[in-house]
Design a protein with these regions (language model features):
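Register position in tetratricopeptide repeats
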Residues: 27-28, 62, 96, 126-133
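Structural signature of tandem alpha-helical TPR/SEL1-like repeats
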Residues: 1-6, 28-41, 63-75, 98-109
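Canonical tetratricopeptide repeat
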Residues: 20, 55, 89, 123-126
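TPR alpha-solenoid repeat register
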Residues: 17, 52, 86, 120-123
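Amphipathic alpha-helical repeat scaffolds of TPR domains
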Residues: 15-24
Length: 134
């Protein structure tokens, strides 16, 4: 993380470093305000980057702002289409936003697109848990 901070210090317009640090904090659920600010800065440089938009959506998810998370993550999925992690993020947000049917559809799509056994296992567990609720 220190190396990312240094990269940003040396080049404040390094959108990849801004997003990387912001997403890392979002994934950890820490420093969410600063994470959002870093990702917003990255998006000013590359406004249509689906991965950066996913990062912003994930910050909103971690903050518990599920409607905004869904809005950003739907946009991220439109821009990246095949990324199973972004699709899983959208499914997670749908579930928290009280839209379990949409969550299930997206979880199933993420399983089809994923090539990582750990991710597939995790998502299948989410599907099973959600199917029991519905």
């Amino acid at each position: 993380m220190a190396s990312m901070r240094k990269a940003i210090e040396l080049n404040p317009k390094n959108s990849a470093a801004l997003n990387y640090l912001g997403y890392t904090w979002a994934e950890m659920g820490v420093q969410l305000e600063e994470a959002e600010e870093l990702i917003q800065r990255a998006l000013k440089i590359q406004p249509n980057d689906g991965f950066y938009i996913d990062s912003l959506g994930w910050v909103y998810y971690q903050k518990g702002d599920y409607p905004r998370a869904v809005e950003q993550l739907e946009r991220a999925v439109e821009l990246t289409v095949d990324d199973p992690t972004i699709i899983e993020h959208l499914a997670d947000a749908y579930e928290k936003a009280g839209r379990p049917d949409r969550a299930l559809l997206r979880y199933r799509e993420a399983v089809k697109r994923s090539k990582e056994s750990d991710q597939i296992k995790r998502i299948r567990e989410k599907i099973q848990r959600l199917e029991k609720k519905i």
